[in-house]
C-alpha cells in the first residue's frame, strides 16, 4: 500500500527518497501539470497529515491551492474527501509514511496509482533532461530546503511495552514536556 523511491544523485550514489520528499514530488507535479493544462481550479484542494512536511503547505500557498491538515492516517484524508464531495475537487494527499492518494476514487493510500504517478513524473522530468533527484532539487530551490532525520527507538519485551505505556500516559497527562530542548 506504499511506494518507496531510490534514485541516483549527481555523484552516482543511490539516494533514498523519504516519504515527505515523495509527497513533495507528487504535489509539485500535480500542481505544475494542472497549471500547464489550464486545469487548476479554485475549488481544488490537497490534504496532508499534521506530521507531513510543511513544504507542501508552501507549495499550496504559492499556487493558491487550498490545503487541509488532518490527523495522521488515511481515514482522516478520506474524511476530508467525503466532506467535500460535490463541492470541491480533491487533487491529492498523503503523509510522511510513504502513503499517497493521487485521486478520490479509493479512500486509502494507493500504491498502484502512486507507482503510475511516479513513473509519469520520472518521464516528465526526463523530457526536461532531468532526473527525479534533479526534480527534488528544483522543488527545494523554488519552495525552500527542508531536512529531517527519523530516529527509531525500540523497547523490547514486556518491560519495553510497559515503559512505552508509561511514556504515553505521561505525555497524555500532566507530565508532558513544556519545552523541547
Question: What does each of the following model-derived ranges do?
Answer:
Residues 1-3:
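Oxyanion-binding/catalytic loops of NTP- or PPi-dependent enzymes
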Residues 19-29:
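Catalytic or ion-translocation cores adjacent to nucleophile or general acid/base/metal-coordination motifs
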Residues 5-15, 33, 37-181:
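Phosphate-binding and adjacent anionic-ligand microenvironments
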